[in-house]
Structure formats: C-alpha cells, structure tokens
C-alpha cells in the first residue's frame, strides 16, 4: 500500500517540487492556500481527520522576511499558529509531521562557526522568532515531530511549478542582461539545491523526533559563493567582474546563517557542500544553461 502524504503549501516553490517528485510513488494530498485555513484549529483537525494521511509535510508559510516584519500578525497566524494547529491535528490523527523550519532562526548568531541545533541564538526578526516558537510548540505537543531547518534554496525554472528569486537564477539573469550583481561580503549561509531537500525528505520521515539542520553547509561568504558559481557559468572568465562585493550590508554585525549538519549526517542523511551542490545542479541540465547564455557555459 502506498504511503499517503499530505503536503501543505503544495503550490509553493518547495511544496510543488515535493508533490511532483513523490507523485506516483506515494498517494499525494496537495493542500494549497485556498484549500485550508491553517490558522483555524478546528478546520485543520477536520481536514486531517477526513484525509487521514500517514505523513504531513508542512511547507505552508509566509517566508518573505520583510512581509513578516511589516505584518507580524499575519506571520503569527501562518508561521506559528498554523504549524501548531497541524501538530495538534497530527497528534489526534496519528500522522507523522515534518515541519519545514528555517535557518533564519540563526539570524542573531554571533558565533564564528556553523550553527548547531541546540545553540542559544537571540531572536532578531519576526520570521525566525515565529519559526523557533513553532518548533518548540510542535515538540511539546508531538515529541516525535520532525522540525527541519532549511536554508535558502535554488532550482531551475520548471514548467508548471512555482519559481522564486534565488542565487542561481539571479546569477544567470545577471549574465544574460550583462549587468553587475552585488553580493554581501559579511554574510555566510548555506545555499541548497532544492532537489537534494526533496529527495532527502524520504529518509527524514524515519528520523527520531527533534530539530535538524537540513541543507548544505558553507564556509564561504555569499560574495565568494556567488563568484565561484559564476565562474562555473563563465568558462572564458570575461564576465567575472559582474559579481561585485557588497561591503556595506551586515558590515557592523556580520550575519552567520551557516548550519552544522552533523546531527542529520549521524542519521545517514547527507547534503553536498554549497558550491558542490551548484556544480551538480548545473551538470544536471547543461543544455538549459547553454540555451540561455550560449558558449559561456562551462564544459563539465
């Protein structure tokens, strides 16, 4: 019998790709914005009882950090109450919950190393605050719940699936338009190919309950990362100056969103390091890149 998986946020960048990947292998229940008000506890309980999924992958969120700062009430309803309601419904229904959390929890980190799940980090933004509070509440209600802290992700545009602004498409666009792209020097974060996240969700369904950093590690600044990926795209090196350093952003308080993934590695789940992940992604579809930027594409 196929496993029944319910995916909230199934019209989004991540949720849509999860649904597309597992379609056919599992029975997929797609839950979009118009299908369920996740901020309504009764509606969530009724929906889960009706669908009776084995696993709930909760991707639904307001993920734009600026929107959350400008409208904290909306963020609380969707990013805190929504996952808490899902945890309550999963407890009642006996479903396994995988909650998509965020590396933005580490936005206040002053550590000079990659962040670990149990590091005490001060809250500095609304989105990260609500994600952390949701994790805590989920595990209180549902100790076997799984909270996966995701990094910034990227992918090629895929017909029928939502695209989002990401480093890969931004770099390609800069090359196509022959315009400079500024990336911060005082910023370190992992950046993950979304397909790695999607595929690793299958073994993640069997993880012990808890919080896990779930994405690519990185020790490079965003500027250095972008420069290296751009070099993969520009084999002749004649457009390398398009990636320029942004010295101003985070100058007074360097940002460190980098994640230590030792915990999930110990459970047998691995991710490529950030630059290696970009290389594998580009190698998977060289014809797509060449159609956009022609002979500038590196020969892998």
What residues fall within each predicted segment?
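N-terminal Rossmann NAD(P)H-binding glycine-rich loop of SDR-like oxidoreductase domains
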Residues: 3-22
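SDR active-site strand-loop-helix element
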Residues: 8, 31, 56-60, 97-103, ...
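NAD(P)H-binding glycine-rich loop region in Rossmannoid oxidoreductase-like domains
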Residues: 38-78
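NAD(P)-cofactor binding segment of oxidoreductase domains
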Residues: 56, 70-98, 132
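Catalytic helix-loop patch of NAD(P)-dependent Rossmann-fold dehydrogenases
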Residues: 77, 82-85, 105-148, 154, ...
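NAD(P)-dependent short-chain dehydrogenase/reductase
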Residues: 139-189, 196
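Glycine-rich Rossmann NAD(P)(H)-binding loop
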Residues: 155, 183-188, 212-220, 266
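Mid/C-terminal beta-alpha module of Rossmann-like enzyme folds, strongest
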Residues: 200-250, 255, 280, 289-300
